[in-house]
Amino acid sequence: MAEAKTHWLGAALSLIPLIFLISGAEAASFQRNQLLQKEPDLRLENVKKFPSPEMIRALEYIEKLRQQAHKEESSSDYNPYQGVSVPFQQKENGDESHLPERDSLSEEDWMRIILEALRQAENEPQSAPKENKPYALNSEKNFPMDMSDDYETQQWPERKLKHMQFPPMNEENSRDNPFKRTNEIVEEQYAPQSLATLESVFQELGKLTGPNNQKRERMDEEQKLYTDDEDDIYKANNIAYEDVVGGEDWNPVEEKIESQTQEEVRDSKENIEKNEQINDEMKRSGQLGIQEEDLRKESKDQLSDDVSKVIAYLKRLVNAAGSGRLQNGQNGERATRLFEKPLDSQSIYQLIEISRNLQIPPEDLIEMLKTGEKPNGSVEPERELDLPVDLDDISEADLDHPDLFQNKMLSKSGYPKTPGRAGTEALPDGLSVEDILNLLGMESAANQKTSYFPNPYNQEKVLPRLPYGPGRSRSNQLPKAAWMPYVENRQMAYENLNDKDQELGEYLARMLVKYPEIISSNQVKRVPGQSSSEDDLQEEEQIEQAIKEHLNQGSSQETDKLAPVSKRFPVGPPKNDDTPNRQYLDEDLLMKVLEYLNQEKAEKGREHIAKRAMENM
């Protein structure tokens, strides 16, 4: 009996794990298919089936029995506590406190407990009340198949869905309908009665927390009113000034005030900076104005100096013009006095002899005798000219001499006239240098000695005269030390040449005084007498013999010079001859020479005035 009992127990123990494994496999396959049908990705972890505490105890007891039977220690492949959460463990511990101890139970009690657990597991889906479920699991009746596309779930064939009408293993941890949203499920779960009960509960809770909530509500209401008023104001402002502001919302009042204060501060700073700049500019402009006034005063002083110089220059020119006229009159009076004053022929011969012995031209010798100076003496200092009081005299004086300034400053070609050409250019018509020399009984210009008419300077070295203008500054004028010595030397030579011309005229006047018959010959020419040419020839021969005897120590060249002079100026009274044209020619030449000398003297005075004006500048 004992052996049969042990065999029966072994068969029962071997069948129990098989039954348990079969039921667990069916439950696992059903649970997996159901999860794949609903939400395989989202609810896979929450839908795990946890075993009941009775099942766990039964499995533990079966393991112990098998270990005792086979006397082998082996670890079970299945961990009964795997996946069990802490609340289940706490619940298990709580249940164990009410259950009897393991050792006190017999094998029959354990078998009975296992069978009851299996029966409960089989009857659990059938005995579940349908009132707690708001809707069935039939997906064909409750919602269309097209809604599955929105939830991106896998579509199962219809033949499988018909057989899958089992309830879920854990209703608490899974949603009834996975294709419905959470808010839809909540709305369907709460009936009007439940909502009414909830409302009453909330009202009771509100009464309990009434005072605090009222204060908070008041604050919230006031804040809402304040914000509503501000919104209304801003809306009105935006509507009224939408075009100006561009449709943007207005800033709050505090920000406006801050921005206005910042703008006022900026404006005040800008105004202060502008005022400082204006003050600086005023100071600078005041300094500049003082400097400009000083410059204006200096320019006025300079202009006044220039104007005074110009006025003085013009006055001197006017006085020079007047003095030139006086000199012309004085020259005429001097010539008349020379004509009236008789000259001795012996004095003339003595002068000629002295000039020959000293190798000095007769003109220079006469000048030396006149001035009482040595040949290389200094030029007589020139006296300052008196200035007229009124400037109106300038225009009156210039009426008679329109080319006064041009003749003084520059020639027509723009360059100063050379002394050699000055005489030839200013000669009157019908009068040449050869005629004058023939009239004086001297050689022609081609055969003259260079010592008698020297050319003391070269034409290439002639400096052009600098015209003066009132606007010319002092810095633009050439320094006096650079050009004045040469100019002074040139002017001295030019004055010497003019003096020679003047002395030539004086010499000619003396000759005319010596032989006054030439002056009275005008009437004789008008009524020529009847005299023979033979008597004239005889008288001329007598004069030549007397001169040769007086100048027996002279050279043949001097005698040749004096021969034509004696021929030109006979000693005795003129006799009637047959050559009246010759006498007319001599008279005309003398008149032209006198006019030329007067003109040259006037020009000399003008040049002298211009030179003095240039030196005083």
From Swiss-Prot:
Q: Which InterPro entries does this UniProt record tie to the protein?
A: Chromogranin_CS, Granin, ScgII
* PROSITE patterns associated with the record: GRANINS_1 (PS00422)
For the modification Phosphoserine, which residues carry it?
174, 268, 432, 532, 555-556
User: What molecular functions are annotated in GO for this chain?
Assistant: chemoattractant activity; cytokine activity
According to its record, what are the GO cellular component terms?
extracellular space; secretory granule
Q: Which residues form the propeptide?
A: 28-30
Q: Where is the signal peptide?
A: 1-27
What assembly does the database describe for this protein? Answer: Interacts with Secretogranin III/SCG3.
Protein name as catalogued: Secretogranin-2
Instruction: Supply the source organism for this entry.
Output: Pongo abelii (Sumatran orangutan)
